Regions:
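A membrane-topology feature that recognizes alpha-helical transmembrane segments
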Residues: 1-160
Length: 160
């Protein structure tokens, strides 16, 4: 049986992998000026929409052995790796924040949110640059906002 702490760690990992999955969409579509919402994710080879049960972060890639269910073409290992990295990032953010401010839960949650947001924006920016595109301005503003929020949360924790 998992303890409450174990459940929280699993929850943060799952949340992080879902955010990581969405980041894969952001990295691909944002530099191209495409919508982040529509159309639904598709196989780049056969253009077939990805079924919801084939879009479960990390797990679906493992079950499908890194291939499209419809055409059998390879799906890059970058996708589940990005999802797992974000899952572990979210775990790290929560552990750091709750150990930094064990007595002030609201400050811990605020720090967790801003740390996770900063890491998410930084990871997406890094992936976009690695793909050879320019980082969109909205992502730069998100990075600055998340950094300011992280610093504010840290200073408020340190002053209590």
């Amino acid at each position: 049986m998992l303890s409450l702490d174990g459940i929280i760690v699993v929850w943060f990992f799952l949340l992080g992998t879902c955010i990581g999955s969405f980041l894969n969409v952001v990295v691909y579509r944002l530099p191209r000026g495409e919508s982040l919402i529509r159309p639904a994710s598709r196989c780049p080879s056969c253009n077939h929409p990805i079924r919801p049960w084939d879009n479960i972060p990390v797990l679906s890639w493992i079950i499908l052995r890194g291939r499209c269910r419809d055409c059998g073409s390879n799906i890059s290992g970058r996708y589940p790796i990005s999802e797992a990295i974000m899952g572990f990032w979210f775990i790290g953010c929560s552990l750091l924040a709750f150990n930094a401010a064990p007595t002030t839960k609201i400050s811990s949650w605020i720090l967790t949110v801003f740390l996770a947001l900063f890491g998410t924006a930084l990871f997406a920016s890094t992936q976009i640059v690695q793909a050879g595109s320019k980082v969109p301005r909205v992502l730069c503003w998100l990075l600055l906002f998340a950094l300011a929020g992280t610093l504010f949360a840290l200073f408020s924790i340190m002053s209590t």
